[in-house]
């Protein structure tokens, strides 16, 4: 979580936009994101130049020499944040509007990169030089605080806090997934260097970014010292789809600022016939919309064959199974209703997971995980596509704490089940002797089938009732009589004083 001072600076930046006449939250977050990208472009270019120098490799800066726009040219160095942020307001505005912004919208001239696809219609909306100057100063201060912070992922937390200002609740049934929950799911799935990873409802690409960061931490040498695997990581590993062009723009920039140059981020209604993907991905990480609007006529027919429904949370599960290759794995968030819903469609998709594939884990999460934006109760489902069954025992875990208070404040706390969840999931042999009264345990497939494929942990968890010994009736009556006498004596004493 970011510090109070950093939060205050971000809130202050928001106030600067409001005072300058830009009040639409989506416009504000877009403009901030563009400016953060421009700042990070300068930093990443410097970093890559240093890395190339250390390895003795040639490197050509994107800011070298002159930049040409039509018949005009400008020194490329003037497009760097570290240079133009010292310009007077009027000159800074002119350089930003006429040079820097067109430069970033045409950064990849081939128009095939995820970034350039959705920058074509991007517009620089800051109305005055004074507003731009104030915003640049505010961002410089925010970056200073981020650089001073000891937090591991302060930039990600800062960006998450920025995104939280888009609205107080999800649009179209989508809620921002907390970063620590995303990280937990990524660690549970342990992505490999040859994985092909997809989020069919990617939003700002949080799952894809986290998977990329995890691979950098755990598979760095395997990926970055092998030309073929590095090419796969940069160009062929990450796929994200969404129906919101603004989210796609932000998601593409999010990926690029995390060092993934060319993810496949595309506009697509994943549930419709325009999504042709079948048996393509080895790993799906997702938190699909729960109650989004749905045009039933556009839903792909093969998804309706699995479960005939208008509920997006069920259709997305059918979609994940279709998009995964045999042996492919999935970790996804679902609302609790998916686990125990009694409709034909609910039972059909649960039966398909249990009987037709290999359901591995159901991790129930407390309702406060998505606060303050939503109070919905959710669970993480983990399964492998086999096409012919394979479920033996399903692992259940009852998460009661995630490291933050479960109220609207979401303050950090000592109670955190996430490290225990990750450790136990990766050491299943230690779970076989666990009892139903404990926080995690296995349930045999047949027992699940016998219970209409109910996947709610409360169906199988046993609660130990500790007997409470109460005093005998005679003792209670004696105590009451004693109290009565004390009250009477007190009243008599009070009357004597009047």
Protein language model annotation of sequence segments:
Residues 358-359, 371-421:
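C-terminal, active-site-flanking charged/polar segments
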Residues 164-167, 295-302:
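Gly-rich Lys/Arg/Thr-decorated short loops/hinges at beta-loop-alpha junctions or inter-strand turns
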Residues 172-286, 291-293, 302, 310, ...:
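Conserved S-adenosyl-L-methionine
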Residues 1-193, 264-275, 364-368, 390-405, ...:
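Non-catalytic, mostly N-terminal accessory regions of nucleic-acid modification and defense proteins
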Residues 42, 204, 245, 272, ...:
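Conserved nucleotide-binding/hydrolysis micro-motifs of P-loop NTPases
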Residues 236-239, 268, 299-305, 364-366, ...:
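Short beta-alpha connecting loops at secondary-structure transitions
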Residues 28, 243-250, 265, 309-383:
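Conserved Class I SAM-dependent methyltransferase catalytic core
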């Amino acid at each position: 979580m970011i510090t109070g001072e950093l939060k205050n600076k971000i809130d202050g930046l928001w106030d600067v936009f409001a005072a300058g006449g830009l009040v639409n939250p989506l416009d504000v977050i877009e403009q901030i994101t563009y400016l953060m990208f421009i700042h990070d472009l300068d930093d990443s270019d410097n970093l890559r130049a240093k890395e190339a120098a250390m390895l003795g490799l040639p490197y050509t800066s994107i800011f070298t020499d002159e930049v040409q726009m039509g018949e005009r040219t400008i020194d490329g160095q003037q497009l760097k944040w570290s240079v133009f942020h010292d310009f007077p307001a009027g000159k800074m505005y002119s350089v930003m509007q006429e040079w820097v912004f067109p430069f970033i919208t045409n950064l990849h001239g081939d128009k095939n990169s995820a970034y350039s696809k959705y920058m074509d219609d991007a517009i620089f909306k800051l109305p005055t030089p004074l507003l731009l100057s104030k915003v640049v100063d505010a961002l410089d201060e925010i970056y200073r605080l981020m650089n001073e912070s000891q937090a591991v992922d302060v930039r990600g937390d800062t960006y998450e806090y920025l995104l939280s200002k888009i609205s107080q609740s999800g649009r179209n049934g989508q809620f921002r997934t907390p970063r620590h929950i995303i990280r937990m799911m990524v660690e549970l799935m342990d992505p490999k260097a040859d994985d092909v990873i997809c989020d069919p409802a990617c939003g700002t690409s949080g799952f894809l970014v986290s998977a990329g960061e995890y691979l950098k931490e755990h598979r760095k040498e395997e990926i970055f010292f092998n030309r073929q695997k590095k090419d796969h990581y940069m160009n062929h590993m990450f796929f994200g789809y969404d129906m919101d062009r603004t989210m796609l723009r932000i998601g593409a920039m999010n990926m690029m600022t995390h060092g993934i140059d060319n993810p496949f981020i595309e506009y697509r209604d994943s549930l419709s016939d325009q999504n042709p993907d079948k048996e393509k991905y080895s790993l799906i990480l997702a938190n699909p919309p729960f109650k989004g609007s749905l045009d039933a006529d556009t839903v792909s027919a093969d998804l309706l064959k699995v479960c005939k429904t208008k509920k997006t949370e069920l259709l997305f599960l059918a979609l994940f199974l279709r998009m995964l290759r045999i042996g492919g794995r999935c970790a996804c968030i679902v609302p609790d209703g998916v686990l125990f819903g009694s409709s034909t469609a609910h039972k059909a998709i649960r039966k398909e997971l249990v009987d037709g594939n290999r359901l591995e884990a159901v991790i129930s999460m407390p309702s406060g995980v998505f606060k303050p934006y939503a109070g919905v109760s959710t669970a993480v489902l983990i399964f492998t596509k086999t096409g012919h069954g394979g479920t033996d025992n399903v692992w259940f875990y009852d998460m009661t704490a995630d490291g933050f208070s479960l109220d609207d404040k979401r303050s950090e706390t000592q109670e955190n089940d996430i490290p225990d969840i990750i450790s136990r999931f990766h050491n299943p042999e230690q779970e076989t002797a666990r009892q139903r009264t404990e926080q995690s345990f296995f349930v045999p497939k047949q027992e699940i089938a016998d219970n209409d494929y109910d996947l709610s942990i409360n169906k199988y968890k046993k609660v130990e009732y500790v007997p409470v010994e109460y005093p005998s009736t005679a003792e209670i009556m004696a105590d009451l009589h004693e109290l009565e006498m004390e009250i009477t004596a007190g009243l008599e004493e009070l009357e004597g004083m009047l």
